[in-house]
Amino acid sequence: MSQDTGLFSIKRPRETLGSVQNFSSLPQPSSALKRTSSIGYQNPPFTSQHTRSMSLLNSVGRPQQPNFQRSSSGGFGADPGLSSVRRSVSSNVFHGTSAGRPSFAPGSMSSNPASQSLQRRSSVFSRPSTGGAMGHQSFFTQVPSAAGVPRDPRPLRDRSFQARIAQELLEYLTHNNFELEMKHSLGQNTLRSPTQKDFNYIFQWLYHRIDPGYRFQKAMDAEVPPILKQLRYPYEKGITKSQIAAVGGQNWPTFLGMLHWLMELAQMMDRFAMGEYDEACAEMGVDVSGDRIIFRFLTGAYHDWLQGGEEEDDDAAAQRLIPHIELMAQEFEKGNEKYVQEMQVLDAENRALRDQIEELEKNAPDMAKLDKQFRILEDDKRKFEDYIQNVQGKIEKYESRIAFLEDEIRKTESELQAAEEERAGLQASVDQQGLTIQDIDRMNTERDRLQRSLDDAVSRLEETHARVMAKESEASAKLEDLEELVKTYNTLGYQNSLIPSTAVNANGQEYELGLNVNERSFSTSQIGGIPSRISPEADRLLAEPFTGYHPAHLLNLDLRGIVRSNLQALRKEINERRKRGIDADLERRNLLDNIKEAMDEKRSEVEALEHKRRTAEEEFERLKEVTTTQKLASDAQIEKMEKELAKMRATMSESVQLMEQREMNTNIEYEQLTLRANALREELHTNVESMLNDVIRFKVHIQKGLEDYENFVVDEVEQELGGDTQLDEDAPMSTEEL
């Protein structure tokens, strides 16, 4: 029978959460962190392959989850690749009918009952991690610790620090009925010089606060190291079995810090269970209400599902889930009522604003008519401006023309006066020579004829010379173009390693072009001689005095023959090298793109850290202002006391010693208040950061546990369906063999 892979499989044998891997991101308490760093000694990051595949129940919607994804290069001692979380049915420790259910969620993954007895974790927080690293990492998760034994930054050797954390631990044990539950009494000196029995009882009680279903069955030196490693205690490498067997003496500060860390972890889990971190998550934009509803559904449904027997049918098992599904739907509807009310208010505001817009549109004048009239006026204005500019240009043009004509008139009048004077002079000279009018006409006619003949000869000579110079200039231009082409060819040959013949691509061939032309001759001097109309450039254009160059003799290489074939072969070779270069370039570009993507991821990580730094600075400034205010108040109080002291000194000389003692006490109290304010500021600052880190990491842990179980259920269904198909295929084959 086919089933939806997104739902629980009711048909297969029941199994617990024991085979679900534990990728816990349980955070450190504030006392285990350095004051100067808010991200040091954190949990190992996940890899980038972790994504949500599908919901456990497709019929119920789930709100969008925040994705604080960052790149990482490793897990906590595991390979950085994808962790194998897909397991076969045989890997379940409770697959057989003989396996029992020792707890609500027994948590070890084994293939036989013997290994099950060794792995007896019962809480969802105590499953050992057997896979690789995961990828959905918040920027609040911890980074991998450095190689070697990490150094504890807490001043555990300080007597005052020991007294403080011991008092906090003692108060926590007293307020939570330690003596009643463990039937072991505590004294004021229990946490100063404890016995081995005191440590064992306190450790077991604190761990039961974290994992109530765990049972201690071995000696403490064998139980404590795996538990600390599983809880990811940052300094568990510095604790040996021999030290656990003798916790007193010099080793006690280390174990006192470890017990205080367990206490803070238990307190954090209690606060998270009571929802004290929900407001902080909401302020950061993370809605955990939906996660709480789904978690309550999963825990309740899984608990009821475990109550059924192995022989319970599918319908009865499905009926067990119906009340939980209905309750989850009701809780989601109740949570969505706030958003529905906000939507209704926004819809009402939207309708009111739309009504106002419509009213304003009705009362407003016709904008289309006004726009049309405005465009017409703009066109008229532009036309008048163009007309004014045109008329102004014509005025300037006519004024300049009038001035020019007046100058021409004055020049013409002066020339006319000079011509009249010349005519009068010529007439006087003719009268003195005694020439007649006929003689003058004949001489003028002869002069005109000779002048015309000279002009014709000169014009023909000029035309011939012009044609010669044009041809010469054309030939010179062609020669210069040819020289430029030869120079360009040789330059390209040098650039492409073809010239000289010893170049890389020449292969012993000569590719350098040269022109077989004469050089300019500067031996003939024309100084003092008859000027020649033939330029010296003509010497380079002629191979002989009256013969030019033959095209085949002008160049020293056969371009169309040998050179062209060699260049074609070289071009093919270069094309092949170019293709190989393009392929290599594409590979390098792909590598560059990958590097850019990695840089973008690192840049986003830096931005997240910068945002976190700014938040810490704002918190520091706020605490600084509070401390400053307190200090000012203390200063005012001190000044007031000093005035009273001076007054009392003036009036009562017999109480001088008493007032001096009071002043000393006041100063001591002021110093204590200052120290206490500084300590309180640091503690609050660290606690705020730790709370935010803890709740986000714990949320990621819960989410990942659900996702792993979802993937496990999907794999089991796929394997079950695959097994049914294989059985159907084997049956016909057996029949044929018979």
Swiss-Prot record:
Residues 329-492, 582-689 form a coiled coil. One of its GO terms (biological process) is attachment of mitotic spindle microtubules to kinetochore. It holds the Pfam family Ndc80_HEC. It comes from the Eukaryota. Its main location: nucleus. InterPro entries: Kinetochore_Ndc80, Ndc80_CH, Ndc80_sf. Residues 20-151 are annotated as: Disordered. Belongs to the NDC80/HEC1 family. Acts as a component of the essential kinetochore-associated NDC80 complex, which is required for chromosome segregation and spindle checkpoint activity. Component of the NDC80 complex, which consists of ndc80, nuf2, spc24 and spc25. This is Probable kinetochore protein ndc80. It comes from Emericella nidulans (strain FGSC A4 / ATCC 38163 / CBS 112.46 / NRRL 194 / M139) (Aspergillus nidulans). The gene is ndc80.
